[in-house]
């Protein structure tokens, strides 16, 4: 690994050398994505989390951030992701995402597939009912 090389954004180098440090937005995105995907596919957690770590480390390697910026980005991502778990809507969407992933990846049992199909039909009926209601309201 090489350090003190030019950054991936040489046009910003003069400013980056004089500016204060800040949490890495790239790291926040990468680590949040890794946490989310790990929850959907826990069987691949090691691989997914390593990739999420590398996403942040790349910011140090190219000279865009200090290591502390990347560490702060991961901390911010973990805090936000933790907070998302207080939302019933988020938890329901995660449950559906895990279910859909297991089916599409061929990991679901027959019971899980039947339950998913039944829920999908229920959601489709509710969506059709809401669309009809909206159409009726728009025509009045």
What is each PLM-predicted segment?
Residues 2-139:
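Membrane-embedded catalytic cores of phosphoryl/pyrophosphoryl-handling enzymes
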């Amino acid at each position: 690994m090489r350090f003190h090389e030019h950054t991936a954004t040489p046009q910003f180098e003069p400013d980056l050398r004089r500016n204060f440090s800040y949490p890495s937005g790239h790291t926040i995105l990468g680590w949040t994505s890794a946490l989310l995907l790990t929850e959907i596919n826990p069987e691949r957690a090691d691989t997914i989390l390593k990739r999420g770590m590398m996403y942040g480390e790349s910011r140090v390697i190219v000279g865009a951030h200090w290591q502390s910026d990347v560490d702060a980005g991961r901390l911010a991502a973990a805090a936000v992701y933790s907070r998302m778990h207080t939302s019933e809507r988020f938890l329901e969407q995660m449950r559906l995402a895990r279910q859909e992933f297991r089916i599409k990846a061929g990991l679901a049992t027959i019971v899980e597939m039947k339950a998913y199909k039944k829920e999908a039909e229920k959601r489709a009926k509710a969506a059709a009912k809401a669309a009809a209601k909206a159409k009726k309201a728009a025509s009045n």
